Structures are given as C-alpha cells and as structure tokens.
Amino acid sequence: MKTFALIGGSGYIAPRHVEAIKHVGGDLIAVLDPYDGIGYIDKHFPNASYFKETERFDRHLDRLTRKGKAVDYIIICSPNYLHDSHIRLGLRYSDNVICEKPLVLKHEHLESLRALEVGNKKIYTILQLRLHPIIQKLKEEWREGWT
C-alpha cells in the first residue's frame, strides 16, 4: 500500500485528493494545515497524523524516514505562493511530490526545482480543475469562438 502526506488538507481541492488516495487504495498518514478543518479527512483516514505547524510536520516526516517508513507521495494543496517551499520540503522526505498548478510563481523557481529532480525524485503537477463544469463550459465556448 502506498503512503501519502498532504500539505493543505483543509483547502478547497483537498477532498478530491483524499478521495483519489482512497480510490487507489493508498493510506494518508500525515496532514499539514494551519486550520483545523480536518473532519473530512478524519472520516476517511482516522489514523492520519494532523499538524498545524510546518515544523512539527517536518519533524514527523523526518522521524518516519529515519525509521525506514518514508512517505511514498507528498501532495501539495497549499496556496500558490507556498508551493515552492512545500515542494522543497516534500522532496526532502519523498521521491514523489504531487502539486496542483501552478507549481511556482516565478520562472527562476521552476529552474531551481528542476535541479532537485535527481535520481528517483520527481515533481508532478495536476490540473485539478480541468474537469470542473465551469472550466469545461469555458473551454467549449472558446473552441466555438475559434472554429
């Protein structure tokens, strides 16, 4: 079973990630969010450790890694301006970081993240709202206007 940690567990898009983790048979073992709106996650993963402070979350992931129980995937659902630092945190403790778009706000940050993808370390991006009905309608209207 693959293990997951989630940064930004109380955000708008987080429930979709929680459902996806459950759908693939994964186990959400750690969640970071400064707001304690975690009831949804408790319902699906009652044993997940919850942290309000980044430092404690960092320490928890470090402890798991030293015990040989490193997290398989770290998912970033935090506000856009935090993506860069959260991706860096994720790559310290996992080979796989999944981040909603945009990965970063500045091009030079993208280049520095690319340099961190060494060995098995990978950063994946998700277009989390691409199937949202409003986005689909906008896409359809755009196509109709250009055909």
Predicted regions and their residues:
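Local beta-strand N-terminus motif with an aromatic residue
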Residues: 28, 71-74, 147
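N-terminal Rossmann-like dinucleotide-binding module
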Residues: 1-47, 69
